[in-house]
Amino acid sequence: MNIIDHFEQENISKRTANTKIPEFEAGDTVKVTVKIIDRSIEKDGKEKLTERFQAYEGVVIAKRNRGITSSFLVRKISHGEGVERRFMTYSPIVHSIDVVKYGVVRRAKLYYLRNRSGKSARIKERHIPIAKTKAAKA
């Protein structure tokens, strides 16, 4: 392993120590919580920073696995318009990633969804079996 790969692995492990990044792929519906920092200037001229969290929910149409620069593209429909946003997987701005639904698709990149609307843009849902535990058997 060369120095750059070692450096990337250190940064990825630092990022994943605080937040768990779930396994997801193209076709899955995810809810990404993003940290937003607002700057406002008070009357006395001082700058005030406020943090807030904003949720962005949509379908993952592309995923790019490239170490520390990994990213994924999420598409949602907002007020009748398609909105796409790319998130860096290991960015400190991304507070959490939650998988809402797992989808069944046959492609790695779902760019064809840009040209579709309504029923033709739907994705089948993949049902994941729940692990059997001792409590479930009893």
Swiss-Prot record:
Gene Ontology cellular-component terms for this entry are: cytosolic large ribosomal subunit
Protein origin, superkingdom: Bacteria
Supply the alphabetized keyword list. Ribonucleoprotein, Ribosomal protein
Per the record, the GO terms for biological process are: translation
Q: Coiled coil among the record's keywords?
A: no
Q: Which GO terms describe its molecular function?
A: structural constituent of ribosome
Q: What does this protein do?
A: This protein is located at the 30S-50S ribosomal subunit interface and may play a role in the structure and function of the aminoacyl-tRNA binding site.
The UniProt entry, under NCBIfam families, shows:
rplS_bact
Give the family, as the similarity comment puts it. Belongs to the bacterial ribosomal protein bL19 family.
Show the PANTHER family listed in the entry.
LARGE RIBOSOMAL SUBUNIT PROTEIN BL19M, RIBOSOMAL PROTEIN L19
Recorded protein name is Large ribosomal subunit protein bL19
Give the classification, highest ranks.
Answer: Bacteria, Pseudomonadati, Pseudomonadota, Alphaproteobacteria, Rickettsiales
